[in-house]
Amino acid sequence: MATTAELFEEPFVADEYIERLVWRTPGGGSRGGPEAFDPKRLLEEFVNHIQELQIMDERIQRKVEKLEQQCQKEAKEFAKKVQELQKSNQVAFQHFQELDEHISYVATKVCHLGDQLEGVNTPRQRAVEAQKLMKYFNEFLDGELKSDVFTNSEKIKEAADIIQKLHLIAQELPFDRFSEVKSKIASKYHDLECQLIQEFTSAQRRGEISRMREVAAVLLHFKGYSHCVDVYIKQCQEGAYLRNDIFEDAGILCQRVNKQVGDIFSNPETVLAKLIQNVFEIKLQSFVKEQLEECRKSDAEQYLKNLYDLYTRTTNLSSKLMEFNLGTDKQTFLSKLIKSIFISYLENYIEVETGYLKSRSAMILQRYYDSKNHQKRSIGTGGIQDLKERIRQRTNLPLGPSIDTHGETFLSQEVVVNLLQETKQAFERCHRLSDPSDLPRNAFRIFTILVEFLCIEHIDYALETGLAGIPSSDSRNANLYFLDVVQQANTIFHLFDKQFNDHLMPLISSSPKLSECLQKKKEIIEQMEMKLDTGIDRTLNCMIGQMKHILAAEQKKTDFKPEDENNVLIQYTNACVKVCAYVRKQVEKIKNSMDGKNVDTVLMELGVRFHRLIYEHLQQYSYSCMGGMLAICDVAEYRKCAKDFKIPMVLHLFDTLHALCNLLVVAPDNLKQVCSGEQLANLDKNILHSFVQLRADYRSARLARHFS
């Protein structure tokens, strides 16, 4: 059995249990090989082991039954014991309730007795207190203070309490009978008050917070309590302003006081507010006045910079102080302090700002024109000048000489950046220093100054000068600088628009001034665009005029009707070469001067005029067969030049012109077929006829019959 018990090892696994049994049986395992294996011995061992297991099972079963009986017996005993405990607990709970009721009854009696005792004791205490006060009053009446409380400096707290009460009593006494004693009490009241304040001062210098708290609590009922607070505030600031930055010093001071004032005074928020008021009205106000008054009349630029910087730093300090407990309406309190410092400077701020901005802008412009040795001329306006301008635009008559600008656009990006920078700073100061109700109006005033000096005095003047510098369309070898003006004006417009959106819009976005500013901006831009359009139109006229001069000078009648038809080199003419070179140069200049759709619009207009010029130019000549081939070569080159425009409509016009030129060389019998071709079918017959009439063989070949 012992052997069987040893086989039951934890954790029990049946397979392992069989393996261990087989291994322990001689001849039952794999030791010794197949020859040593004895199945009968193994079977016998298994049978014996099963019998042992059955015996073990019976023994364990008997033991389990015995334990179950014992467990049931103990459970019955435990249940009986629990019932007994419940009964005793109920008895104890009843005793507890009785005791609680008795305690409540006794407590009620005690409270009643206490009220009775208090009713007796309070008058007695008052009587004792009154007796003491009468005793002390008699000492003042006799003129000799004998009590220890008045002579012992260590009992100053008790003396203060007594004298404060005597002082209140003395105020109720008639002056004619008790004037002397009232005077003595008042004198002692004042002496004790001074002693307490001196004690508070000494404790503050020693850093004894607990002593300061005790003295402040005693002084709270004295008239000199406010003086105690003043002393505290004054001593707090001793040695507090040692750095170069008074605003940083003030912030550190207030933060330090905020941490300790609650440990000293019963009303810390009032004391801290008084300290902050003292810092603002005395220290900061004198510093601000010193910084601003010295440059207020002599240097407007420095004055505005200092005002903006000081106001910003003051408001930043105020924002930090908002974290402290200063009472219920600390926002209003701090705003009033800031206003008290800066009100005299903010009242006329916008006048100083606009005055400085005007003078500064005028100086920037004048300095630029002086650097160019240019005296600004008066641009004529009114009826006569407008009439001349309209006549010149429509007829190109030389109504007075054009101005030679020597290639100068009189536009400077540096000047523009300086003007915008000055205006940007003005907008920033305006945002910070203007009252919210005045902000949109003040911002609009700054914007009008920007419009006056940037848009009118600089850009508009440059456009007018550029317009006056455009030569008439019949001028030869004219230098066309207006496109440079266009290029620079476009760049400046972008900068102007960016500042409008970035710096002006946030200031006026929620006010009626928004629509006013947008309208003014729209009017300015429309006015500028109209002058740009006028200048571009006249510049294009000059370009076409220059092409006319080239064609008139270089194109010969013999180009298209050579004397020797058999000795002609088929290529484009010299006039075509020079015109195409000129056109390509102008196209490149236009692309560099403009952006976006403006390039396409101007190139389309130039392309249409270029086509009209070549069309009319070809109408002036008579063409032989070989001359017609030369004309086709020229138009092919013109068409190649038109491709550089990258405008489909212009290319289509030259494609059609090229097809028309084919009418100059086509065989008479095929003429009708060509006229009805895809490219020419939609053209008016008169146009086709006019081109056919240019052929040298028009009469001899009787070509008119095709159009009858």
UniProtKB/Swiss-Prot annotation:
InterPro entries: Sec10-like, Sec10_HB, Sec10_N
Record's subcellular location: Cytoplasm; Midbody
Keyword Nucleus recorded: no
GO CC, any one term: cytosol
Protein's UniProt keywords contain DNA repair: no
List of residues that carry Phosphothreonine: T122, T395, T405
Record-level GO BP terms: epithelial cell apoptotic process; establishment of planar polarity; exocytosis; Golgi to plasma membrane transport; membrane fission; mitotic cytokinesis; non-motile cilium assembly; post-Golgi vesicle-mediated transport
Residue positions, PTM Phosphoserine: S412
Coiled-coil blocks: 40-101
UniProt keyword terms in alphabetical order: Acetylation, Coiled coil, Cytoplasm, Exocytosis, Phosphoprotein, Protein transport, Transport
Record GO terms (molecular function): small GTPase binding
Modified residues (N-acetylalanine): A2
Tissues and organs where the protein is expressed, per its UniProt entry: Ubiquitous.
Any Pfam family: Sec10_HB
Subunit details: The exocyst complex is composed of EXOC1, EXOC2, EXOC3, EXOC4, EXOC5, EXOC6, EXOC7 and EXOC8. Interacts with EXOC3L1.
Function field: Component of the exocyst complex involved in the docking of exocytic vesicles with fusion sites on the plasma membrane.
Family: Belongs to the SEC10 family.
Protein name, UniProt field: Exocyst complex component 5
Highest classification ranks of the organism: Eukaryota, Metazoa, Chordata, Craniata, Vertebrata
